[in-house]
Amino acid sequence: WMDVRLLYAFTTLFVIPICLLLNTNHSRTTAYRYFRHRQGFGRLRAAWSTYLNHCLFSQIVIDRFAVFAGKQFNIEIEGYESFEQLEAETKGFMIFSSHIGCYEVAGYSLISKTKRFNALVFGGEKATVTKGRQKVLVHNNIRMIPVLEDMSHLFLVNEALDNNEIVSMPADRVIGSAKSITHELLGAEVRFPAGPISVATLKEQDVLAVNVMKVSAKCYKVYVKRLSYDKQASRKEQMQQLTDSYVKELERKVRQYPLQWFNFYDFWT
């Protein structure tokens, strides 16, 4: 682990300060606003938290590639019984993730013995990232479904659910002009993608929220929470209830781990 910690130190002391000074992608600005206005921190605390936030992000990127290289982290799981309960049923189910912590480091540790795991990932990644991920996941019955512009990935998602498999997808970012659902998060309105909510309610799927948070240099903690909604209610009410449940869990984790918020853009509109 010394090599990883040396990388942590190098990025903390040299890389992050330069990135924050340049602020080329406005991550410093958006992170500061998040801490100042959404978390309610004072100016000095918000500025310091912005630095720590970027340091944590760099560490998680390092951890991600360390996993691809075969490194092992200690994994704690809270709420695993919810996953086991749904896995034991005949029907498949869905998992909603978010851009907090690092789902990829430990989220795929929720391995099913009976159902194939399908993970929706954004296309356009570098070949080294894709190759590294496939190397790690090839023996775990996990299929990666890249998000494509022609929307063909939706057919694979529907096929997987029709085959009673598990489908995992991020549920916090609206891409392009996609349909959205407006909901309050940390005291202000946010547009959440309607796609994951729509698919889940249309297919009458059970849904888990899974968030993976870094708790130390060697350890991540996986939080599994079953999201509730009334499948007998109208479709509109179902979508609202499921959104409420997802956002409530997201806000709980963001309050608990404020430094691990990694949506580096104007998330609140």
Model regions: which residues?
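Conserved beta-strand termini and adjacent loop/short-helix elements that scaffold enzyme active sites
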Residues: 78-80, 120-122, 147, 225-227, ...
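Short amphipathic alpha-helical segments and helix-helix/interface helices
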Residues: 83-84, 107-108, 133-134, 157-158, ...
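Hydrophobic alpha-helical segments typical of transmembrane helices
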Residues: 30-31, 106, 132-133, 195, ...
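A conditional alpha-helix N-cap/helix-loop micro-motif detector
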Residues: 75-77, 100, 126, 147-150, ...
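Membrane-anchoring hydrophobic helices of lipid-metabolizing enzymes
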Residues: 1-97, 134, 141
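Non-catalytic C-terminal accessory region of glycerolipid acyltransferases
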Residues: 112, 139-140, 151-269
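Catalytic core of membrane glycerolipid acyltransferases/transacylases, capturing the structured
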Residues: 42-45, 49, 53, 91-149, ...
